[in-house]
């Protein structure tokens, strides 16, 4: 059953979250706004909201089929989805399958090296501090999550990685790394939240001699046309799983 937005709860860089008539359900509205480097670079990618909403809807539905609990309920429009109301943990969980991005800059590594087993990192969601990398001990010190929750986040992230690698392979893409966010439901259970899209996943097409970027790095580093890149990801997803709204 569709719910109309009633009160804007939160507006972030890429989405707006609204209350609905049902306190257990929020409406998530995706925007075309694009940011990088902790919002130091700003712009817009035409159609990004629709791409990210539709891709995320399909990915969340796929993950639910694989037994991964998440907040997705239904896609109710091109840029809108209904989600479960959660208390979002102030952590980003990053899983890396190859060296890329900030990991290379931070540790002086060559880009594109395989990482086995995958690397799991935690970042404190705090714009004023620049979302710093934190250890489980830092998380305990800051009381961001319990040790048991941190352990659960790590195990969930690795399980999600296995499923996402299979999903993106079906779209003829390699999942280099990605960012996850989680929240707690009314029972205190941890559910996957936020989005899974070219904004949050580093996706390479390795069909040629050199990897071809099809993600937010197109905008972040001016590597090509982000509109075309995002639309290509959407078309590959739709070809792989079908083009119907997941109602």
Swiss-Prot record:
Pfam families: SAICAR_synt. PROSITE patterns: SAICAR_SYNTHETASE_1, SAICAR_SYNTHETASE_2. CDD domains: SAICAR_synt_PurC (cd01415). The keyword Zinc does not apply. GO terms for molecular function: ATP binding; phosphoribosylaminoimidazolesuccinocarboxamide synthase activity. It is an enzyme of class 6 (ligase). It catalyses: 5-amino-1-(5-phospho-D-ribosyl)imidazole-4-carboxylate + L-aspartate + ATP = (2S)-2-[5-amino-1-(5-phospho-beta-D-ribosyl)imidazole-4-carboxamido]succinate + ADP + phosphate + 2 H(+). InterPro entries: SAICAR_synt/ADE2_N, SAICAR_synt_PurC, SAICAR_synth, SAICAR_synthetase, SAICAR_synthetase_CS. Its EC number is 6.3.2.6. SUPFAM superfamilies: SAICAR synthase-like. Pathway: Purine metabolism; IMP biosynthesis via de novo pathway; 5-amino-1-(5-phospho-D-ribosyl)imidazole-4-carboxamide from 5-amino-1-(5-phospho-D-ribosyl)imidazole-4-carboxylate: step 1/2. GO terms for biological process: 'de novo' IMP biosynthetic process; cobalamin biosynthetic process. Keywords: ATP-binding, Ligase, Nucleotide-binding, Purine biosynthesis. Belongs to the SAICAR synthetase family. This is Phosphoribosylaminoimidazole-succinocarboxamide synthase.
């Amino acid at each position: 059953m569709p719910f109309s937005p009633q009160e804007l709860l939160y507006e972030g860089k890429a989405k707006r979250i609204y209350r609905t008539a049902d306190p257990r359900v929020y409406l998530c509205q995706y925007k075309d706004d694009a940011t990088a480097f902790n919002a130091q670079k700003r712009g817009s990618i035409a159609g990004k909201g629709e791409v990210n909403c539709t891709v995320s809807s399909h990915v969340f539905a796929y993950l639910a089929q694989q037994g991964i609990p998440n907040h997705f309920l239904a896609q109710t429009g091109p840029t809108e989805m209904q989600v479960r109301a959660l208390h979002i943990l102030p952590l980003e969980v990053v899983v890396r399958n190859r060296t890329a991005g900030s990991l290379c800059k931070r540790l002086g590594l060559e880009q594109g090296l395989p990482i086995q087993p995958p690397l799991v990192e935690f970042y404190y969601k705090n714009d004023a501090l620049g979302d710093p990398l934190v250890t489980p001990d830092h998380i305990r010190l800051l009381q961001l999550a319990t040790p048991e929750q941190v352990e659960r986040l790590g195990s969930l992230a690795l399980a999600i990685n296995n499923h996402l690698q299979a999903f993106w392979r079906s779209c003829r893409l390699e999942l280099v790394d990605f960012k996850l966010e989680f929240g707690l439901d009314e029972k205190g259970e941890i559910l996957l939240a936020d989005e899974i899209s070219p904004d949050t996943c580093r996706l390479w097409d390795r069909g040629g001699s050199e990897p071809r970027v099809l993600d937010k790095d197109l905008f972040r580093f001016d590597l090509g046309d982000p509109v075309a890149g995002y639309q290509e990801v959407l078309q590959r997803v739709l070809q792989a799983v079908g083009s119907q709204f997941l109602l």
